[in-house]
Swiss-Prot record:
The lineage of its organism: Bacteria, Bacillati, Cyanobacteriota, Cyanophyceae, Synechococcales. The keyword Nucleotide-binding applies. It comes from Prochlorococcus marinus (strain MIT 9211). GO terms for cellular component: cytosol. This is Alanine--tRNA ligase. One of its GO terms (molecular function) is zinc ion binding. The gene is alaS.
Length: 890
């Protein structure tokens, strides 16, 4: 596929970001690559918080831990990196959220094909002139040099040899590794080939990286050749869009620029007329909102831990920069809508999760606005004394007592050209940690490596959970906060490894068992287990010591919570039936993409190109309940993996299988490779109910369902809602829908009537104000307080007054719009054309006035609006406005 095929008017209309993505995927699909959807931003890899690279979902394949999905794969992977967050908006190319286009070979083609296709894609499909391209290679990679020089024909002066730090990839100190080759775009080839410096990002931009995994490095550092060589590549979508669309930075591509325009609209300015420093805030907002929308879509909620903290930090930076620009009101919902609209065609799940995304944006924004206003007032008090620095104790008090993020304290300090004493801040944090007894519910990821190494020294756990729910066990190891410990005491949150366990460890989509560990009796020593994971065949039990003391070597009783186990068995068998029913009703090409089997419900993700219709869902559900009623007995047996696959057993990519596998067979219905726990007979499930179907990525659907007791819980909850609504509306249950529709229509009519009445009141009050205008020379001004008038009506009133008073006029209206929030303040300023020509700027005039009311705002020279959170100083603020306006007009 060429540029011309993608866009008939490509010579006058550059490729859009979406067309670039499509062209890349199509190019490699034509060359035998399987197109896979983007993985979630929340990775399976416990060593990283977020998906930071296109290859991350395939890391287990590259390391030889998992089977390859295909020998050739191509993806467009959404990624987030926050290590350079301070550079976002300040450079042309740094972003937190980006898409990485990548083609991968798992033991198939290698260096020659990868280089040839990279060149063909760049020069033919995307139409880049070869004279604008520069290539880098690892200094010792003569094979790559020969291919670039003699097969591709690149000028040797434009093939740059680089050191290991720049052009050699490795997965760690040991393991698979190999040289890289990168393609750069040269914005100024007329400068010639002498003294090419690829670190000069004003001239060069790297847009395509090819990694040739051909070696294995052992513990001594010695390199040996791999039997199967792999290819891992990455092309930044935003960077390629910058090049093809001929814009000065990634932010002004069609992937991001509409967000900058939306921010400019909210501020009331033309983005192209803003200065370089101001544009930093626009770019930060445009970048971060894309990251936030995608994170929330992938199930992340703002919090103070892990990836939740990353989301919270990004959201708070958006709000902070919005306030710097003078946006006077909450704006994340408006911005979120634009971000969803920009990305919805590639990620349809954004539309399906729109309400969840917008609700989380609004919730976190309102929460932070309160924190921000309080913290900024405190910081303003500190800065009013012109300190040389903000002490660590002051920064810590803002953080600990008022919830004001350290990063924002640093940013505000930097804006005022002073520093924060970070060493003293860290000391205060350390004292706080000592004072607060650790009872953390999470393990620091930086300690995960310690736990992994310790677990590798332990013997594999003997799992007895298929046969029994109680067992006598010996404590092999105890971990507290990821570190090895010899004993644990009351209230310690611990992880325990046992020699024998009846507890199922999370795998295959099924969550781990819950239960208790105790010595001779529960009064002697009791540990409540809330989850169990498998780490290299060692089952690690996580829980809290409720009483007594536990030591390594203790002999204890392990007891699984039988009700939760039973629910997991029901939901797991129901999941197998769901996959079988989907294959029968929707299509045999259905394949599993993921699953979750919990105690309360089940979730099944599967590859499917279109939504499953309501009729199909009804048939799927009916079929499953038929199989349940037919009382099929399950047959569980161990088989050689080749025999199992030959017998038709379904396997899933992502699961690790040995030569012997466990097969769960519902004769005539379903046969799967599965290590999970199941019921003995389908009749034990009782009932099955689908509660939701949605898309979570391009080509991947998700069904959520309940089974067994969960069905009764679901219907009881529904009945409770129906009963409450019937009582509330005083109608029968079958009349609720009609009543709701009627009420919706009534609310719409009342809303329109209310808005009309408010506008009439505002205009009535406005008419009386014209005669009260104050005259100064040839100008007239009105500064007046109007309470109980909504923002929109206040804006209309100000504009009407200026029209009536003429070009030599100035109007400032302010008030508290609602009785329900008496501290909320709205301010509006409108200036006539000659007043603006006189040198007055409505936005700049209104800002300091709003600040007196604990707020801020801004706008255009002729019109501005602002908000505040403190109505008490409003009258004094208006008096100040009168003084300043009179002085300016005299």
């Amino acid at each position: 596929m060429t540029v011309e095929q993608l866009s008939p008017h490509s010579k006058s209309h550059p490729l859009t970001g979406e067309e670039i993505r499509t062209a890349f995927l199509h190019f490699f699909a034509e060359r035998g690559h399987q197109v896979l959807p983007s993985a979630s931003l929340v990775p399976d890899d416990p060593t990283v918080l977020l998906t930071i690279a296109g290859m991350l979902p395939f890391k287990p394949v590259f390391l030889g831990h998992e089977e390859r999905p295909s020998s050739r794969v191509v993806t467009s992977q959404k990624c987030i990196r926050t290590n350079d967050i301070e550079n976002v908006g300040r450079t042309a190319r740094h972003q937190t959220y980006f898409e990485m286009l990548g083609n991968f070979s798992f033991g198939d083609y290698f260096k020659k094909e990868a280089i040839q296709w990279a060149w063909e894609l760049s020069t033919k499909t995307f139409g880049l002139d070869p004279k604008y391209l520069v290539v880098s290679i690892f200094r010792e990679d003569d094979d790559a040099y020969e291919i670039w020089r003699n097969i591709i024909g690149v000028n040797p002066d434009r093939i740059i040899r680089m050191d290991e730090a720049d052009n050699f990839w490795s997965s760690g100190p040991t393991g698979p590794c190999g040289p890289c080759s990168e393609l750069y775009y040269d914005f100024n080839p007329e400068l010639g080939n002498h003294c090419i410096d690829l670190e000069d990002d004003t001239r060069f931009i790297e847009f395509y990286n090819l990694v040739f995994m051909e070696f294995n490095r052992d513990s001594t550092g010695r390199l040996s050749s791999l039997s199967n060589c792999n290819i891992d590549t990455g092309m930044g979508l935003e960077r390629m869009a910058q090049i093809l669309q001929k814009v000065p930075n990634n932010y002004e591509t069609d992937l991001i620029y509409p967000l900058l325009e939306k921010v400019a609209y909210l501020v009331g300015v033309d983005y192209q007329k803003t200065d370089k420093k101001t544009r930093i805030s626009y770019k930060v907002i445009g970048d971060h909102i894309r990251a936030c929308v995608q994170l929330i879509s992938d199930g992340v909620s703002a919090s103070n831990l892990g990836r939740g903290y990353i989301l919270r930090r990004l959201l708070r930076r958006i709000v902070r920069h919005g306030r710097l620009l003078g946006i006077p009101k909450p704006f994340l919902i408006d911005l979120g809508e634009v971000a969803i609209s920009l990305m919805k065609s590639t990620y349809p799940q954004l539309l399906e999760r729109r309400d969840v995304i917008l609700k989380e944006l609004q919730r976190e924004e309102l929460r932070f606005l309160e924190t921000l206003e309080r913290g900024e007032r405190l910081l303003a008090d500190l800065l009013s004394n012109n300190p040389k620095e903000i002490s660590g104790e002051q920064a810590f008090e803002l953080y600990d007592t008022y919830g004001f993020p350290l990063e924002l304290t640093q940013e505000i300090a930097e804006e005022n050209s002073i520093e924060v004493d970070l060493k003293a801040f860290e000391k205060a944090m350390q004292r706080q940690r000592i004072r607060a007894k650790a009872a953390s519910t999470t393990i620091d990821l930086t300690l995960q490596d310690t736990l992994d190494k310790a677990v590798r020294e332990l013997k594999p756990t003997n799992f007895k959970g298929y046969e029994c729910l109680t067992e006598t066990s010996t404590v092999q190891a105890i971990f507290i906060n990821g570190e090895l410990a010899q004993e644990a005491q009351e209230n310690d949150v611990i992880q325990v490894a046992l020699d024998i366990t009846p507890f199922y460890g999370e795998s295959g989509g099924q969550i781990g068992d819950t239960g208790i560990l105790f010595k001779e009796s529960v009064t002697n020593c009791l540990i409540e287990i809330d989850s169990v994971i498998r780490n290299n065949d060692v089952f690690v039990h996580r829980g809290i010591v409720k009483n007594g003391r536990l030591q390594v070597g203790d002999i204890i009783q392990s007891q699984v919570h039988h009700i939760n186990r039973r629910r997991a068995q029901i939901n797991h068998t129901a999941t197998h039936l769901l996959q079988a029913s989907l294959k029968e009703i929707v299509g045999s090409e259905i394949s599993q993409a993921g699953s979750l089997v919990s105690f309360e419900r089940l979730r099944f993700d599967f590859h499917c190109s279109s939504p499953v219709s309501s009729e199909e869902l009804e048939k799927v559900e009916k079929k499953i309940n038929l199989w349940i009623s037919e009382s099929h007995s399950l047959v569980v047996k161990e088989m050689k993996i080749d025999d199992a696959k030959q017998a038709g057993a379904v396997a899933m990519f992502g699961e690790k299988y040995g030569t012997l596998v466990r097969v769960v067979d519902v004769p005539g219905v379903s046969m799967e490779l599965c290590g999970g726990t199941h019921v003995a007979n389908t009749a034990d499930i009782g009932a099955f109910k689908i509660v939701g179907e949605s898309g979570i990525a391009a080509g991947i659907r998700r069904i959520e369902a309940v089974a067994g007791p969960g069905v009764f819980d679901y219907f009881n909850a529904r009945d409770s809602v129906v009963r409450i609504l019937s009582e509330r509306f005083k109608v029968q249950s079958n009349e609720i829908v009609d009543r709701v529709i009627a009420l919706q229509d009534e609310v719409k009519l009342l809303g329109k009537s209310l808005i009309k009445a408010q506008e009439e009141i505002a205009f009535a009050k406005t008419s009386a104000l014209v005669s009260k205008a104050t005259a100064i020379k040839s100008s007239h001004y009105i500064i007046h307080r109007l309470d109980g008038v909504p923002s929109e009506a206040l804006q209309s009133a100000a504009k009407v007054l200026v029209d009536q008073l003429g070009d030599c006029s100035a109007v400032l209206l302010a008030g508290t719009p609602t009785q329900s929030d008496p501290n909320k303040v709205i301010l509006v300023a409108a200036f006539g054309a000659k007043t603006v020509a006189h040198g007055l700027h409505a936005g700049k005039f209104l800002g300091p006035i709003a600040k007196m009311c604990g707020g801020g705002g801004g706008g255009r020279p002729n019109f501005a609006q602002a908000g505040g959170r403190d109505a008490k100083p409003l009258d004094k603020a208006l008096d100040l406005a009168r003084e300043q306006l009179m002085g300016a007009l005299l």
